[in-house]
């Protein structure tokens, strides 16, 4: 689903509308330019660069700079200030100088979200952000994403049902690619078909 929304996979039928416009024929980069930004199930960060520089590169990409000529945030006060603003927003300010590869898995997911937010998205598509996490780490990332809800529109694909019910205002449940239910969290929680498929009551 996220592949189709983000333009990486062409739909067989139907249309996709975003921000009042029909975007079904737009390429993935054009959809990104329109404000639809995604994270991936497998963490996608620059592991050999600092947390600050990861966010700085996203800012430069948003501003149209080539990565061949990217500027080091430590040598550019304006760029560093912009990147630090994003890190403060995502509670990563204390990790600014840490290599991305040295972060805990949950912190790497936070960094990936920070990189997405640095592009000033209108909608953030999150593809299984809790993938590979234990309960404690998943809970921390859920709290982090919950703190973002008031500022950003997010569409979340996730199999961690605790995270789904903690984060979502509206839930659509897919089974083998078919939508079997759509509604508010309590409506979904009480849906017998959903309970049989996902909540362990079948």
Placement of each model-derived feature along the sequence:
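Glycine-rich phosphate-binding loops of nucleotide-dependent enzymes
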Residues: 1-202
């Amino acid at each position: 689903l996220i592949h189709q929304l983000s333009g990486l996979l062409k739909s067989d039928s139907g249309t996709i509308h975003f921000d009042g416009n029909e975007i079904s024929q737009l390429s993935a980069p054009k959809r990104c330019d329109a404000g639809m930004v995604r994270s991936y199930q497998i963490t996608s960060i620059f592991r050999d660069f600092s947390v600050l520089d990861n966010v700085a590169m996203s800012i430069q990409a948003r501003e149209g700079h080539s990565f061949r000529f990217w500027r080091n945030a430590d040598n550019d006060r304006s760029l560093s200030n912009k990147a630090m603003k994003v890190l403060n927003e995502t509670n990563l300010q204390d990790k600014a100088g840490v290599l991305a590869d040295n972060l805990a898995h949950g912190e790497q997911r936070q960094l990936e979200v920070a990189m997405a937010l640095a592009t000033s998205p209108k909608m953030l598509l999150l593809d299984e952000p809790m993938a590979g996490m234990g309960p404690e780490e998943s809970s921390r990332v859920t709290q982090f994403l919950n703190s973002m809800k008031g500022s950003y529109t997010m569409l979340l694909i996730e199999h961690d049902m605790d995270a789904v019910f903690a984060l979502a205002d509206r839930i659509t449940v897919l089974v083998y690619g078919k939508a079997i239910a759509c509604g508010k969290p309590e409506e979904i929680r009480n849906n017998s078909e959903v309970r049989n498929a996902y909540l362990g009551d079948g």
